[in-house]
Curated annotation (Swiss-Prot):
Pathway: Amino-acid biosynthesis; L-lysine biosynthesis via DAP pathway; DL-2,6-diaminopimelate from LL-2,6-diaminopimelate: step 1/1. Catalyzes the stereoinversion of LL-2,6-diaminopimelate (L,L-DAP) to meso-diaminopimelate (meso-DAP), a precursor of L-lysine and an essential component of the bacterial peptidoglycan. The active site is at C78 (proton donor), C232 (proton acceptor). This is Diaminopimelate epimerase.
Length: 296
């Protein structure tokens, strides 16, 4: 039997991004890709991202998080999921631990993130510094200026999308800025093709963004390893950074996604702050039947 059988989980969402939080502190259990896929496939535990909480690795941190996409792949960052973990570690009776001033320091394979409560159901995450060099994102070939890279969809003389910005927020993003409503583009068809484009050796999150004012952006996201999503916090952060670099906006904006709105600020110290809501939908336990026949 899988050691995950009968483990308790929280079902949450952040601005529409479906999140499952699984607490594995005090154990040596690691989630295998096949187990993550099985959890995602079940109607009771379906997720866009699975946030697995482990004991801290680095002194002074509160927990280590592993982040899984629906296809079982791991990600280095998930802003909406991090807010949900912040809620769980501060408010859930079975998970909460004492924290100073409602603040937590969490670690992922991409680095440290700080979470702070704003209101009962709103949290701010310090997502750290964006990575802007081509080899940090990473891209498969050198681009001296990642504000625009050479990539397009459609005919050479009349492309549907072209010249995206490239940014990493602990995971790679390509952002296409457009003048018309992002909903008018078939991102469900375009997204998977671009996600796996050879220019992105680690694949990429694909966003279509419309700047509607100096401090508002409308955004649609195809999420690497998950597909079309109602919200993606790291994509919102990457989009604000990219738009600011192109002087389309200042250094702060409200980003409207199908699942809700996020407030993003790229501070003068180069850190990106994301503020948004969390919602607890319920809890459950992982059925042993989910893992029957899995070999990991």
């Amino acid at each position: 039997m899988s050691p995950l059988a009968n483990r308790r989980f929280l079902k949450m969402h952040g601005a529409g991004n479906a999140i499952v939080v699984l607490d594995l502190r005090g154990t040596s259990i690691r989630v295998a890709p096949a187990e993550a896929r099985a959890i995602a496939a079940d109607a009771h535990s379906r997720f866009d991202q699975l946030m697995v909480v482990h004991d801290p690795v680095t002194p002074g941190t509160d927990a280590f998080m592993r982040i899984y996409n629906t296809d079982g792949s791991e990600s280095g960052a998930c802003g909406n999921g991090t807010r949900c973990v912040g809620y769980a570690l501060l408010d859930d009776p079975a998970m909460a631990r004492p924290a100073e001033n409602g603040c937590l320091t969490l670690e992922t394979k991409a680095g440290l993130v700080a979470v702070k409560r704003v209101t009962d159901r709103s949290f701010t995450v310090d997502m750290g510094q964006p990575r802007l060099r081509w080899d940090e994102i990473p891209l498969a070939e050198p681009f001296p200026d990642t504000r625009r890279i050479e990539l397009q969809v459609g005919p050479i003389d009349d492309p549907i999308l072209h010249s995206p910005a490239a940014v990493s927020m602990g995971n790679p993003h390509a952002i296409f800025f457009v003048e018309r409503d992002p909903d008018t583009f078939d991102l469900g068809r375009i997204g998977p093709l671009l996600e796996a484009h050879p220019i992105f050796p680690e694949r990429a999150n694909i966003s279509i963004a419309q700047v509607t004012s100096r401090d508002t952006i409308k955004l649609r996201v195809w999420e690497r390893g998950a597909g079309l999503t109602l919200a993606c916090g790291t994509a919102a952060c990457a989009t604000v950074v990219a738009a600011a670099r192109l002087r389309m906006i200042g250094r702060a904006a409200r980003v409207a996604l199908p699942g809700g709105e996020l407030s993003i600020e790229w501070r003068a110290d180069d850190h990106v702050l994301m503020t948004g809501p969390v919602f607890l939908e319920g809890e459950g336990s992982l059925s042993p039947d989910l893992f029957a026949g899995l070999d990991g």
